[in-house]
């Protein structure tokens, strides 16, 4: 090990602990605040553990609005959005790998251009299109972006991951008569599994926390997703901070759980699974 590596190596663990504390403290205070008695104002000083501990705020939040229904709605939308986004983004990324010459450069450039377009710039055209199709007040406008890979970033991420694989692998498969779809399914996807899981997690977070599009397209309360449910909760009782924090915990818990399940695969060095971490 070099002297510079030894010098910085001693700081890695303390730095990692500091970053972890910076991210975990807000979550801890959110959970702690949700366990206070309903209606209490925020504490004047940071409170690691409330006294007494009460779950009444959770009961009150679920009684005030139908958080169970909104959670199920969000899960349904995410369950449809995430697989579609992964499928389309991976196919598009692999197709970019197979395109040769200047066409590939043009496609990459167009992807970067699309990536820089603000989402808000597309709201009016999208709303006009979905209204013309009669799809307002349905979940289709929330799921439809997944048919385009949800984000050009996911397409580029798959393309870069496929590009890191040995070209000889695909050349040999082509000589054996394997179709492009077969190469994607049998060679490409198994070897970029960490990237697939990362894209799935990012797509889940984007779908789960999507507030603006449900606010624009959904009017029936029975179709509301969880972010809109939290907005309804805040509208009905905006000064009940423990109850609002309880709703925030309900909305945050699935994302944290998904990350805890998926994070061990991100840089997993296994057979063909370490391409992302090299």
Regions of interest found by a model, annotated:
Residues 1-6:
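Short, Lys/Arg-rich, polar N-terminal cytosolic tail immediately upstream
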Residues 9-278:
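A structural signal for multi-pass alpha-helical bundles of membrane permease subunits
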